[in-house]
Amino acid sequence: DIGLNLPQYNSPVIDGVRQATPWVSSPDNIKNFFQTGYSMNHTVALSASTDKTSTRASLSFRDQGGTTPNTDQKRYAMAVNTKMTFNKYIDFDLSANYIRTKSANLPGTGYNSTNALQSIMQWFGRQVDLKDLKNNWDQVDEYGKYTHYNWIQSFHANPYWTLNKNTNSYDRNRFYGKTSLYIKPTDWLKFEGRMGLDHYDSNQFSRILWNIDYPNGYFRSFDRSMTEFNADFIAYVNKNFGDWALNGLAGANYRDYQTAIMGTGADELTAEGLFTVANAHGTPYTLNDHEKRRSNSVYANASIGYKNMAYAEVSVRNDWDSTIKDAFFYPSFSGSWILTETFPGLQNGDYLNFLKLRGGWAKIGSATDPYRSNAYYSLISSSFNGTTLFYNPTILPPTNLRPESVKTWEVGVEANLFNNRLHIDAAYYNKVTSDQIMNANVATSTGYTSMYINAGKISNEGVELQVSGDIIKNPKGFNWTATLNWAKDKSRIDELYTDPVTGQPLDAYQIGSSWSVKNYAMVGKSWGTLVGTGYVYNEDGSILVEDGIPVYEAGKEIGDVTPKWLAGFSNEFSYKDWSFGFLLDFRLGGDIYSVTQAFGSQTGILKHTAEGDLRENGVVLGQNYMTDKVFKTADGKINDVAVNAEDFFYNYYTICEMSVFDGSYLKLREAHLTYNFPKSILEKTKCIKAAHVSLVGTNLALLWVHKSNIAHIDPESTSTGGDDPETAATSRGFNSGVGFESNSYPPSRSFGLKLGVTF
């Protein structure tokens, strides 16, 4: 907007020469790309009952439109619940649910050419007119061939082309339900026989007509199914013995779990737009896999109470799982003591109304994935003289794989004060996770590359606090109730495992990665340490610079992904038939490496690259940029070297620490305004028992983020979508894990109107 004229992608061409046109900004070009999404929910429910039966059936439909063009999702659901009483000894209940979820196009995520935001959030300057790209994305030449109209083709496609021609459809059908038969021979003994089924099948079809990665087309089709069957037999006891009360159960469970997946595809097509295996150019992609596992379990639980003042509970469970050779047993114990019942003198209506102490200890075991404990052979697609070939696995079968173990103990206190207007619940817990199943490298002389072993020990300790108070309480007037939830968890990696190749204890285990930044579990550190290129510091803690540029090294610890604490603060106000409430969420800490911030700074599309006359005066670290930090040369001199802004930001991404931001935030999570219709009005209808109307909003505002979050990215919208077809049902992109962000979609603010009527 300073009077420049430059040849541009959409400038007229005269005699083969692209002409210069005004170099001007396109106001709101990013804002105009997004559209107002919508979600419409419709539910109809019917219920009927007699003295021996009760039934409820419901139908629901949800229609959603995305905030980007040509994205949608529809959800259909049916549910039936019925209960029958044959006589005083026998009851029967049944529940069945069916859900279908489908979409013609789910948007891609992450650093991926299927993500339309990759181009917009990293490469599009303000000069790009998105309206022009929208109007011409399907432009063809005189031969009817697509021109792939775009302002530049070096790294990305026109985002409207991506959303309209490179689509990801999804269709899933799920059925789940259970049925139970109850037999009650006495008033204190009951038996239950229960069967439950959960099944789904889904299809995900990803197609690329053209993009930078696949100029000759691409497709993947995955058909996946899962079936889980559970059968339980349980005996319940509920018996009082004078001042003592016993509640208990004992049961057995049979579980069968199966998954299957079939996939086809091609990385290149012979004929454009024909997404079939027969049209694959070269060897097509095929996948056919399945998993089966079964388990048998016995379990029991007993709770004993004395005079409604003291309680003790014990639970035991033993599992035999097909994925682990040996059975595993895990118990738990807990107890609570209501002091105000034991010592009534403690109760004072004006101060203390209720006081309870509680504590518990538990051990939990978990098995592993199928086929890890034994050797198995994989099919080779080719054959030899008509004979099917198999190959030996590269993973050495473990000799004695044990289940993972989690041991936890907890103590807590609950209190009601000031005529039950103040409620406090506080707890401290300690958790140790050990025998984690990890994939460790082995010497190549064994003929294998790795093996699964039991290793690792992680300790967690934390505090959870809830404080709720009726600040103003007036049954006939204004009321105000506020609730604060606060939680802090501190983790520590105590040990990993001894490397079978080197014989040395391992001090770091990679969890995830994004570009050159890796997330490690490191011994002695909290879970999730980001490692990458980072600053070199002087002895006094200042950052070392040379010629105005920070000196950096690889392999530096540049972040901790674990938040320091989380909090939520809710308020509910009511006055007669009106009520209003809102919820604030707060997170402190939790570092995130942002690819958006790295490349958005390199290309100059982020606001901070042009603030403070940096373009005109250059970047002087510590003076007009990153003024919260101190930069010094090796001889201790304060940095005063101005670096050309274009040169500085072009190399911004090479120092990964510059793109790590503190994930702290304050959010207005939700709010609602409700009106309850008075009974005096409803009585006139003679059929409506209750009715209310509510205006609701969710994810309403990101009120504050840490100053290091210069791209103002929602820390909760970080993308972790993977290539797994079931994961990819909601997002496509690379799976970088916790602590990474790449081209994430801006958070969506939603508003809704709810009408509830009870007949």
Residue ranges of each PLM-predicted region?
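Residues embedded in well-ordered regular secondary structure
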Residues: 1-69, 106-112, 120, 127-130, ...
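Conserved small-residue
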Residues: 1-21, 453, 470-561, 592, ...
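Extracellular/periplasmic, surface-exposed regions of secreted and cell-surface proteins
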Residues: 11, 40, 75-77, 81-90, ...
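Extracytoplasmic gating/loop element in the C-terminal half of outer-membrane beta-barrel translocons
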Residues: 17-19, 30, 321, 589-687, ...
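Flexible, solvent-exposed loop segments that connect beta-strands
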Residues: 20-22, 213-216
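Short Pro/Gly-enriched beta-strand edge/turn motifs at strand-loop
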Residues: 23-29, 284, 550-554
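Predominantly transmembrane beta-strands of Gram-negative outer membrane beta-barrel pores used
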Residues: 33-34, 41-63, 67, 79-85, ...
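Glycine-rich, aromatic-lined ligand/substrate-binding cores of catalytic
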Residues: 560-595
